[in-house]
Amino acid sequence: MRWLLEYGERDRHLETIALLTFALLALLYYVLASGVVGVTQTQGQIAGSQYVPDILLALFRTVAAVLSVFTLISICTDEEGSLSLPTLYDSRQSEEVLLLGIHRLVPFTVWSFAAFGLYFSVAAASSWALVLGGEVPGWALAAVPLAFATACGTALLVTSVVTFYLIPNNAAKGYDVRKYFEWHEMLMHNGNVVILGADLVLGGVDMTLGMVAFPLLFGLVYIGFANAYAVLGGGIYLYDFLDPRLRGGPAIHAILFVVICAFYFLALALDALSEWNVLVGVVAVAAGSYSIITLRKPSEFRGQPA
C-alpha cells in the first residue's frame, strides 16, 4: 500500500479534485434535501441532564469551553513553537519545520479541538439558559446536535490517528515524539474523547445517522484549507497523504471519507448504548476511550531518548 503515498509519472490532482467536488455537491444536496439542519430537539435534551443537576452540567460544559479557548490561545502564544515533519509542496520531500504563532492552528487536531470548543460554548450557553429559567433559542436547538456530531466524529479520528499512526510512525523514523506529550497536545488528542464521552453519557443530545454529513463536510473544508495553505500560504502539507498529486490521491481521500464515517458510526453506537442503559454506556465509553488514548511515555517508543 506504500505506493499510494508515492508520486507517479503523472500527478493525480485533477482526479482527486473531481472526487472532492462530487463529494461536496452530494453532501450539500443531501443536507438541503433531507432537512437534517431543521430538525430540532427539545430544550431538555439540549441543555439538561437526567443524571446530574442541570447546574452541574452547565458548569462542566463551561469549563470545557474555557479550556478549549485557553488551549488554542496557549499554543498560538507559545514561543518555543512545535517541530513538525511535513511534506514541502515544491520539493515534495519531508523536512522538519518549526511552526510558530498562528501557523500552530493549521493541524487537523487543532481544527477538531476548535469544533470541540464551539460545541461546548453553545451547549454551555444553552444549559445556563435552562438553569436561569430562560428559553434556548431555536437556532441553538438545531445547531448543538450538529456541532456535537462533528466534534465526536472528528475527536475519535484525531485520537486514533495520533495514537496508532503519527506517534509510532514518527518514532520509527527517529523523530522526537515528545511534543505529542505536552499538556496541550495530550488535551487535544486524549482529553478530547474523555470530555466528550462524559458529555455523551451525562447530557441528552441525540445524534442521528444522517448527521454523518457534518463530520464529512468538516473534513472536506479542512482538506480545502490544507491545499490552499500548501499552495498559497505555508508551502507545506502537514499530512503527506493529503497531497492530491499523489499516485493514490483519489483512493486515499475516498478511504478518508470511509474512516470518518466509521468513527462517526462508533460515536453513534456509543450514544445508542448510553440511551439504552446508562451503566452500559459508561462502561462502553470508558473502554472505548481507554483503548485509543496514549498512555505510554515517549521513552517507551523505539528510537526515543530515555
Describe the residue ranges of each PLM region:
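Early transmembrane hairpin module of multi-pass membrane proteins
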Residues: 2-4, 11-130, 143-145
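Membrane-interface transmembrane-helix boundary segments in multi-pass integral membrane proteins
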Residues: 2-21, 106, 233-295
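Transmembrane-helix exit/juxtamembrane "anchor" motif
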Residues: 27-41, 76-80, 125-128, 266-280, ...
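Interhelical loop segments of eukaryotic multi-pass membrane proteins
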Residues: 36-48, 78-96, 130-139, 170-178, ...
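Membrane-embedded alpha-helical transmembrane segments of multi-pass integral membrane proteins
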Residues: 67-70, 74, 116-126, 151-165, ...
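Interfacial segments of alpha-helical transmembrane regions
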Residues: 134-156, 207-217
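Membrane-interface loop-to-helix entry segments
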Residues: 181-193, 250-255
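Alpha-helical transmembrane segments in multipass membrane proteins, preferentially the mid-helix core
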Residues: 191-207, 229, 263-271
